[in-house]
Design a protein with these regions (language model features):
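Rossmann-like NAD(P)-binding element
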Residues: 1-17, 32
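Rossmann-fold NAD(P)-binding glycine/threonine-rich loop
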Residues: 34-58
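Alpha-helical segments flanking ligand/cofactor-binding loops in enzyme cores
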Residues: 18-22, 46
Length: 212
């Protein structure tokens, strides 16, 4: 029935999106989704253009609304030297009643994938790459206090540098980062999990037995 609509909006887990995109291109239907763009979208974009349709990734909250707001702010400024973006989705304090002070509002696989994703930032004009373990280290985090929510911890979230060219501020920007906000204690738990290898899919050997 896809050929009977103008656009398909995908809110499915990431593993399904390429199949939906292939169907959208086949049927000549615009494709909108909330996840980060994939490198393969460059080639698929040519197929989409031939069909007269658009592929619009990163149209959610983060990424999405945050980038729209950043673009609007940038257009109102003469020059940008720093760009820092924060996004979050957390349970109310009374519901944060587990060791990670968090509850999944999207997919747990998506949460684990995000916590394995390295971060890329710009600091004093230098590109810095951070491993998943490094982004949860205290020296790479900071606290943010919000009037209605109180204190939260901020850790780096993915590649912030690529957006400088997209937003046309690469020449003037000296520092940039994208951050996720969580209740205090969240990052300390996940740093231990990352350091112990619990987020890796590769099997390890323990006393001669393969464990994954």
């Amino acid at each position: 029935q896809m050929n009977k609509v103008d656009a398909v909006i995908v809110l499915l887990p990431q593993e399904f999106r390429m199949d939906v995109l292939a169907l959208a291109i086949e049927n000549g239907v615009h494709f909108v989704e909330t996840s980060y763009a994939l490198p393969s979208y460059t080639d698929l974009g040519q197929l989409a253009e031939a069909k007269g349709i658009s592929i619009l990734p990163e149209c959610g909250l983060d990424p999405g609304i945050d980038l729209v707001l950043a673009g609007q702010a940038i257009r109102e400024l003469d020059e940008v030297h720093e760009l820092h973006a924060y996004g979050t989705g957390v349970p109310e304090p009374a519901a944060a009643d587990n060791p990670i002070n968090y509850k999944v509002s999207w997919t747990f696989a998506g949460v684990l994938s995000a916590y394995q994703r390295p971060a890329k930032i710009l600091k004093n004009g230098e590109v810095v790459n951070l491993s998943p373990s490094q982004m949860f280290s205290p020296e790479n985090m900071h606290k943010v206090t919000l009037d209605t929510l109180g204190e939260m911890e901020a850790y780096y979230n993915g590649d912030a540098v690529k957006y400088l060219d997209i937003l046309n501020i690469a020449e003037t920007t000296r520092s940039t980062g994208r951050y996720s906000l969580r209740w205090p204690g969240h990052a300390a738990f996940w740093k231990k999990m990352v350091d112990l290898g619990f987020l890796k899919e590769e099997a390890i050997h323990v006393n001669g037995q393969e464990v994954s």
